[in-house]
Amino acid sequence: MTLLNVSGLSHHYAHGGFNGKHQHQAVLNNVSLTLKSGETVALLGRSGCGKSTLARLLVGLESPAQGNISWRGEPLAKLNRAQRKAFRRDIQMVFQDSISAVNPRKTVREILREPMRHLLSLKKSEQLARASEMLKAVDLDDSVLDKRPPQLSGGQLQRVCLARALAVEPKLLILDEAVSNLDLVLQAGVIRLLKKLQQQFGTACLFITHDLRLVERFCQRVMVMDNGQIVETQVVGDKLTFSSDAGRVLQNAVLPAFPVRRRTTEKV
């Protein structure tokens, strides 16, 4: 089943120019893609190529200058109030900048309950139980519930944001560099959790990343973005190779997970 369909998407930002005239900076150019239920897709590209802007458009935080975005066959621009509420529940996003994604005055308990209060019909006791369950799933415990964001480490806060997104059991989870910054052990644990969610609920995942190792470990398809365009799409196999210049540059930039020991024939 197709969850998300994007056709001919273009976007630009206006900024001031000389003589008070606005100039337009193109960020996305004729982007088209589809995401199906239960699949895991990576959007790979260097910083500044338009990945995060595309993500904001996909979740409805901004409206595109041109093109169409449809959720389960319905254009986002035509969703009624009830459909838009269901859309906000079904598609969740975890941002790279976790500090800006939360209210620093609220406790973790309040942060986790917020989407459940607005998007689900759960009693307070059920919300608290699910909050505890989601914390455990991201390797945190109830001791953080009464803490506020400034009292948490960056990795802890990122996992709180992930738990908040998972609490409403979304159909599509978009992670904007949200896993790449975790250490390898935590990253592996989060990936196991996401795989479990896919099996249970058919959750689709879109990883927005520059981390090729993450793509190879978890994704089924990868789209390469460069200068606001998707320049290549590949199925992830045993040996992932790219045909585009942008893809090859990213692949060549990957460092080995562990130092490679050089063999030497010199005798001491």
From Swiss-Prot:
Its EC number is 7.2.2.11. Coiled coil: none annotated. Keywords: ATP-binding, Cell inner membrane, Cell membrane, Ion transport, Membrane, Nickel, Nickel transport, Nucleotide-binding, Translocase, Transport. It holds the Pfam family ABC_tran. SMART domains: AAA. GO terms for molecular function: ABC-type nickel transporter activity; ATP binding; ATP hydrolysis activity; nickel cation binding. Its main location: membrane. ATP binds at residues 45-52. Signal peptide: none annotated. It is found in: Cell inner membrane. Residues 4-252 form the ABC transporter domain. It comes from the Bacteria. It catalyses: Ni(2+)(out) + ATP + H2O = Ni(2+)(in) + ADP + phosphate + H(+). It is a peripheral membrane protein. CDD domains: ABC_NikE_OppD_transporters. PROSITE patterns: ABC_TRANSPORTER_1, ABC_TRANSPORTER_2, NIKE. One of its GO terms (cellular component) is plasma membrane. Belongs to the ABC transporter superfamily. Nickel importer (TC 3.A.1.5.3) family. The complex is composed of two ATP-binding proteins (NikD and NikE), two transmembrane proteins (NikB and NikC) and a solute-binding protein (NikA). Part of the ABC transporter complex NikABCDE involved in nickel import. Responsible for energy coupling to the transport system. This is Nickel import ATP-binding protein NikE. It comes from Shigella sonnei (strain Ss046). The gene is nikE.
